[in-house]
């Protein structure tokens, strides 16, 4: 069983003291191609491309131009699971997971990324900003199409070493479209979270993101390897709701 989640635009590069064996990014050649493309963009072009403020565009420009795709170590990079710090990662709270759970996560959790493609928890990453939905073409393909074959092939390789061949999709649509479901040789299971608002159940972005992190943590901490145990998730008031679920989707409501 492998979980996939989205990355986060917010990143924390404060040093941490750990004794983990860090790993290098999977798709180094593709990263070089992408970062070299991004380095050609001036501040004004970044502002327009990424639909961000001039100040933020300057920060992104600086990040990309200081990016060294041939060097990943503690001087310029940090393990991905401790770096991403958006809503999903607030639910995950990776810095409070024990060592054995982090090591388990290394083989059961993957983060999708516009720049890195697939990221394992202990892969070292440098500061960047490139959402999967960014309107940029690489080798004549939009970003998620550029990554699709590479990511799907790598996932199939990882699953060849897994006993339970189920992909738990806790990523957003923007990122999960970078996986070719038709070419994935395993079962795909979506998970959704809904809130009861005045008698109607709705998916609310900020709550759903944090819940994805909570679910990721639940699966990792409990070493869950089957769907029936995922249904037992009852964190933060969420419970499995069969009325909104089917064989390809588990929905949790509160």
Swiss-Prot record:
This is UPF0246 protein FTL_1717. One of its GO terms (cellular component) is cytosol. Signal peptide: none annotated. It comes from the Bacteria. It comes from Francisella tularensis subsp. holarctica (strain LVS). Belongs to the UPF0246 family. Coiled coil: none annotated. One of its GO terms (biological process) is response to hydroperoxide. InterPro entries: YaaA.
